[in-house]
Amino acid sequence: MLFDWRNIYRRTLPSKWRYRMGIYGRDVIRDTWMLGFQNAVTLLTGLLAREQRLGQLTLPNYSAPVWFRLGTADAFVVRQVFTVQQYAPLTQISNVKFIIDCGGNIGCSALYFMKHFPDAELVAIEPQRDNADLFRQNLLSFSSRVHLIEAAIWSRETELYFRNSNAATSSYEVAEVGESEVIKTVTLANMEISQDRHP
């Protein structure tokens, strides 16, 4: 007698769990296809981890590993850039010489751009120190073409107070006064960026 696994699956799991398993199942298959089995396991571990620790991925066609924090939003950022490839439409643009990355995070988008635009230079702005440290580590092999400014983009130059609202390392609450980490700001107009002169 053959088991009807679909019926067992439908009867034993509530619909919300079936939905979640379907979503994660598709994501894991896509991660495995795009990144390889070991990287997909590491990425899934990063998504499910309850405590923060450092992990690395060795991506196909990238010479150095990509470092990220397991148990934070870093794994979602890695997935968006390297598996979902949200920036792929931009690679159709030709003759790119200069890129500004406002919110460099841990450097995934910058790494993607450096790979796809080999003649471009990039200036990234990232206010959070832990993110900036990982950014530098991830972009070490492109250090001659990448410039990092540890500041926040704002409408005027001032000091802001950043507070991390949760384990998401890509979102922060911002105020001009407060008791959290003090971050200096820059404006695009005051950065005086040109292709010949970088800050």
Give the role of each language-model region.
Residues M1-P199:
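Phosphate/nucleotide-binding beta-alpha loop and adjacent structural elements of enzyme active sites
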